[in-house]
């Protein structure tokens, strides 16, 4: 065991501050990172890795972008946190509302978990209903209401997926199969008048990378509208990754509430939830639904977010990045086929994922669970040795940044070829 990991385990549970970082899913010990720049991570031994985790999505410009660092450095001179309104909060809020379809107002928080938790509380308060629908394999943070897995039948209420989550909360959560349109219609036919909201990752990035099938998001929109339920698109991951307007712009489906995070914070701890004036004015202090946060709207985080979003508004930003994502994902699939290894890839926007399976298309959680995870683990460690860092779990999406060059893609494809020859 490395000294760094041994030291960490003495004072931090499991040696990490988020479980996936511990490498338990893939085996071995986590890599401790010292610095990062552009598309590269450097560990404490100064080994360089081409990074496709990108801090789990936020670093769409690449690590330590000069403009973002300059904005943060400038803002730091005036203080770290005030606990009072600042003009930069309004500046970023206005920009996001002008970008995201149907968003009139937005509330900043400090994490994606806070954003989804608050969005659900708002939906329940606004509708006067308690039940929510979520989808198996979608992750919306670690709040109690959302750590619920599917029950024994399609429409049974869920059961807690973690000790410490009261069973009474599970009674209000219905967990359905992602991309199952008929199941959604059945649920609304049976209990539509009890449903406060549906929350969904428009592209499921926490069971690797699963785009919605044609008609799935549209059905959610239609059923919510008919039942008077709110549709929450959890764009913490997809926001600004499928284009400037996120998944809702990419797929043309307008939610009632959007949650954001990751990219929007430029690498700082930021989350947000927003929607129409009518819905958002139901939040305190204008409305009865309480939500608050000591560090919400932190000025340094706002500066990082504003600097990031301003660069994303460049009309030429996304096209080359989408093309590189396609080249990388399809290139790895081609190499796997040449090596006789069953592999399917999904990609959309700047997100991508690989599945070691005979299936030609992977569209739901059950298919993801049936993949060859031991082979993925070997692939992960092989790439790590080659100097390529992908997510240390087969259920997590990969990402690209504007800092990744054609040479980085070529390097990665050669690394994948080398690994396929060994596994």
Curated annotation (Swiss-Prot):
Swiss-Prot/TrEMBL GO biological process terms: protoporphyrinogen IX biosynthetic process
Subcellular location: Cytoplasm
Modified residues (N6-(pyridoxal phosphate)lysine): 262
Main location: cytoplasm
InterPro entries: 4pyrrol_synth_GluAld_NH2Trfase, Aminotrans_3, Aminotrans_3_PPA_site, PyrdxlP-dep_Trfase, PyrdxlP-dep_Trfase_major, PyrdxlP-dep_Trfase_small
Keywords: Cytoplasm, Isomerase, Porphyrin biosynthesis, Pyridoxal phosphate
Reactions catalysed according to its record: (S)-4-amino-5-oxopentanoate = 5-aminolevulinate
Protein EC: 5.4.3.8
CDD domains associated with the record: OAT_like
Top-level lineage group: Bacteria
Pathway it works in: Porphyrin-containing compound metabolism; protoporphyrin-IX biosynthesis; 5-aminolevulinate from L-glutamyl-tRNA(Glu): step 2/2
Cofactor: pyridoxal 5'-phosphate
Signal peptide: none
GO molecular function per UniProt: glutamate-1-semialdehyde 2,1-aminomutase activity; pyridoxal phosphate binding; transaminase activity
GO CC annotations, alphabetized: cytoplasm
Record text on subunit structure and interactions: Homodimer.
Family: Belongs to the class-III pyridoxal-phosphate-dependent aminotransferase family. HemL subfamily.
Protein name, entry field: Glutamate-1-semialdehyde 2,1-aminomutase
Source species of the chain: Saccharophagus degradans (strain 2-40 / ATCC 43961 / DSM 17024)
Highest classification ranks of the organism: Bacteria, Pseudomonadati, Pseudomonadota, Gammaproteobacteria, Cellvibrionales
Gene from which the chain derives: hemL
């Amino acid at each position: 065991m490395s000294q760094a990991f041994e030291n960490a385990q003495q004072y931090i549970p499991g040696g990490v501050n988020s479980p996936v970082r511990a490498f338990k899913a893939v085996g071995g010990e986590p890599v401790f990172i010292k610095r990062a720049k552009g598309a590269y991570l450097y560990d404490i031994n100064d080994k360089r890795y081409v990074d496709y985790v990108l801090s789990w999505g936020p670093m769409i410009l690449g690590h330590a972008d000069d403009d973002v660092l300059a904005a943060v450095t400038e803002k730091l001179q005036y203080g770290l946190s005030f606990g009072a309104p600042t003009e930069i909060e309004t500046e970023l809020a206005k920009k996001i509302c002008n970008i995201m379809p149907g968003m009139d107002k937005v509330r900043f928080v400090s994490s994606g978990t806070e954003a989804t938790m608050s969005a659900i509380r708002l939906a329940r308060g606004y509708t006067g209903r308690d039940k929510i629908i979520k989808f198996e394999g979608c992750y919306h943070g670690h709040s109690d209401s959302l750590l619920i897995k599917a029950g024994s039948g399609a429409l049974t209420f869920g059961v807690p997926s973690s000790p410490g989550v009261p069973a009474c909360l599970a009674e209000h959560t219905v967990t359905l199969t992602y991309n199952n349109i008929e199941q959604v219609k059945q649920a609304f036919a049976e209990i539509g008048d009890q449903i406060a909201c549906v929350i969904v990752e428009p592209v499921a990035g926490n069971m690797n990378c699963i785009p919605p099938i044609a008609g799935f998001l549209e059905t959610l929109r239609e059923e919510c509208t008919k039942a008077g339920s709110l549709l929450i698109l959890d764009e913490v991951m997809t926001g600004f990754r499928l284009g400037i307007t996120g998944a809702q712009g990419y797929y043309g489906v307008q939610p009632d509430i959007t949650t954001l995070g990751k990219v929007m914070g430029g690498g700082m701890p930021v989350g947000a939830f927003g929607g129409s004036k009518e819905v958002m004015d139901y939040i305190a202090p204008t409305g009865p639904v309480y939500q608050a946060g000591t560090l919400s709207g932190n000025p340094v985080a706002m500066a990082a977010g504003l600097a990031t979003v301003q660069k994303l508004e460049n009309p030429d930003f996304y096209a080359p990045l989408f093309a590189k994502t396609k080249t990388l994902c399809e290139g790895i699939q081609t190499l796997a086929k040449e090596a006789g290894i069953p592999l399917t890839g999904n990609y959309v926007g700047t997100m991508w994922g690989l599945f070691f399976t005979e299936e030609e298309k992977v569209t739901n959680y059950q298919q993801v669970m049936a993949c060859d995870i031991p082979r993925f683990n070997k692939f992960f460690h092989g790439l790590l040795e080659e100097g390529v860092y992908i997510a240390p779990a087969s259920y997590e999406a990969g990402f690209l940044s504007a800092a990744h060059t054609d040479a980085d893609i070529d390097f990665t494809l050669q690394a994948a070829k080398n690994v396929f020859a060994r596994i």
